[in-house]
Amino acid sequence: ESDAKATSGGWFWHSGETIKSAERLFQMYLETVGRNATLILNCPPDQYGVLPAHTVTELAKLGKLLHNRLAWPVEGLNEPATDLAKVATIEVSDTRTGGKYEVGNLTDGDKETYWGTNDGDLDATITLTWNTPQVIRYLVMQEPIKLGQRIKDFMIEYSEDGATWTELCPDMQTTTVGYKRIIPLNGSTSNSYGNGYNARKLRITILDSRACPLLSNLNVY
């Protein structure tokens, strides 16, 4: 759980206080929700019990950023960001036998279904391929957390030509996934929506796990 202030004046309302910009709030979202935490964002009402207009404005802008970048459904807006994982061909190095653990579970939007490897297989690769290069900025992964946090180390690479690979965000710690991990592929939470990368392929290599790795959700934006 991450408790945070949206405003400058403290936990309660203070006259003349300002609110953090929508971009700063989005950064906070990436650094909390995107790192396997619950964000409790304090937005204090004024002395009349009303949220100040500047607070409402920035929160509405934050909603648009989440909608346009991470496909949060916001009523009244146009179509959200396209989940590029849903239009990719996905190949995996190993699929668990004896059950319904197929790769399609990664993109079905159901937290109760998941892809996994066989017992004893603690590493794996997941490769997404597109017919034409796609501009990618974020990777979202979720483990079926009721079965434990398993993944200990992973690496992300992309290929623009489909043959040569370049590691993404090499300086970012990629040691856990947990309930939800949102990774800005340029490695920056403060400027995550930069130019993006033209990718024909995206590869996630799980290097080590506490037990056979499992993933319930995989999204690319």
Language model: regions and residue ranges:
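Carbohydrate-binding surfaces of carbohydrate-active enzymes
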Residues: S2-T95
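Generic recognition of flexible, low-complexity loop/linker segments
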Residues: Q27-Y29, I126-L128, Q142-E143, R203
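Short, solvent-exposed loop/edge-beta patches enriched in aromatic
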Residues: V33-R35, T132-V135
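Short strand-loop junctions, especially beta-strand C-caps/beta-turns
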Residues: P44-D46, Q142-P144, L207
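Disordered, acidic Ser/Thr/Pro-rich linker "stalks" and the adjacent N-terminal cap
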Residues: L62, L66-P133, P144-R150, P170-V177, ...
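Trp- and acidic/polar-enriched beta-sheet ligand-binding modules for extracellular glycan
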Residues: D119-D123, Q134, I145-Y221
